[in-house]
Swiss-Prot record:
NCBIfam families named in the record: nusB
GO biological process: DNA-templated transcription termination; transcription antitermination
Pfam families xref list: NusB
Entry keyword annotation includes RNA-binding: yes
Protein name, per record: Transcription antitermination protein NusB
Organism: Desulforapulum autotrophicum (strain ATCC 43914 / DSM 3382 / VKM B-1955 / HRM2) (Desulfobacterium autotrophicum)
GO molecular function: RNA binding
Family according to the record: Belongs to the NusB family.
Function: Involved in transcription antitermination. Required for transcription of ribosomal RNA (rRNA) genes. Binds specifically to the boxA antiterminator sequence of the ribosomal RNA (rrn) operons.
Amino acid sequence: MGDRRQARELALQALYYFDVDKGSPDELLALFCSNFEDRIDESIRPFFLDLVKGVTQARAEVDDLMNRSSSNWKVSRMPIVDRNIMRMAIFEMLKQPDIPPTVSINEAVEIGKRFGTRGSGAFINGVLDKIRVLKNIDRGEKE
C-alpha cells in the first residue's frame, strides 16, 4: 500500500473520530496522534496532517458541495464513513492541485469499498464526479 493511501486511511479514521466525538479538533487530533503514533510513520505524517487539518478547516464549504451534489441525501444522513471519505477527496480536488482529481476520486472509491457498505463505492463515485463537473476541476486531464 502506498504512503498516500495509508495517510488517507488514517485520516479517515481520525475524521470518523472527530465526527463521533464532537470535541475540539486540535485536542482530538493530538489524542488521535498519541494513540496511534506507532501507525503514523514519518513518511505519511505530513500528508495525513494536511488532510485532517484541511478537511476540518474547509468542512463547511465541502459539506455544502456534498449537499448540492447528492440527490436526496443530506450530509447529516450519509453514513459517517462515506461522508468523511468524500470530504477528503473534495478537499484534495479543491485544495491540492498536485493531485489529479481522478486520482482523488479513484482513491475515495477504493477506500469506500474497503471501509464502507456494499454501495459506498458507487455512491461516492457519483457524488464526487458531480462535484468535479460542477466545479470544473480537471487540471488538464483527458476524459
